[in-house]
Amino acid sequence: MSITAAMVKEIREKTGAGMMDCKKALTEASGNMEKATEILREKGLAAVAKKAGRIASEGIVESYIHGGRIGVLVEVNSETDFVAKNQEFKDFVKDVAMHIAATNPQYVKRDEVDPLIIEKEKEFLTKQALNEGKPEKIVEKMVEGRIDKFLKEICLLDQPFVKNPDVTIGDLLTEKIAKIGENLSIRRFVRFEVGEGIEKKEENFAEEVAKQMAK
């Protein structure tokens, strides 16, 4: 099958890979677009793994305020000041800040979660499953699945991206590392919401942010 310029363009837009890399992947995949995308993704992930050990000490702190009701500060690091000034990097950090406003994660990644919190959640879920009358032999597997779901809800890198739920924030970060060519790291964030911790009328500001991001 002949590889057309339109095919190369489509794959390039989808993956952010170089033109020659796209052409090689399409040739290797005999023109199969999905297979070519997978080949590039695998190569991109390999490149990301090599970059992961490099120190990312530059970057930016981005702020996002939604209607004076929700505020977010997030620090995302890059290896160089040059990348920190790159518009694509800035847009990515802005998206992360808005995502945090919308979803209210508690941690950046799983290894930040206190093991005692996980243990307490396991105990609660085990009791809940047994009270539901579930057989003991399947309770452990059920609890494992529910703990995984719990961690996905509270850890930023595991959350489905508000703008595109087919990918997680972790996937998005990996894509940006492969595309930009530097190690990037979401280091920390803080989120404030007016009246947080005070009993008040229920208002879903997070849903408002998600709708705004979808525009």
Swiss-Prot record:
Main location: cytoplasm
GO cellular component, one term: cytoplasm
Gene3D superfamilies: 1.10.286.20, DNA helicase RuvA subunit, C-terminal domain (1.10.8.10), Elongation factor Ts, dimerisation domain (3.30.479.20)
Location(s) in or outside the cell: Cytoplasm
Region (Involved in Mg(2+) ion dislocation from EF-Tu): 80-83
GO MF entries: translation elongation factor activity
Keyword terms, alphabetized: Cytoplasm, Elongation factor, Protein biosynthesis
SUPFAM superfamilies in the record: Elongation factor Ts (EF-Ts), dimerisation domain (SSF54713), UBA-like (SSF46934)
Pfam family, one: EF_TS
Free-text function comment from the UniProt entry: Associates with the EF-Tu.GDP complex and induces the exchange of GDP to GTP. It remains bound to the aminoacyl-tRNA.EF-Tu.GTP complex up to the GTP hydrolysis stage on the ribosome.
Family as reported in the entry's similarity comment: Belongs to the EF-Ts family.
The protein, known as: Elongation factor Ts
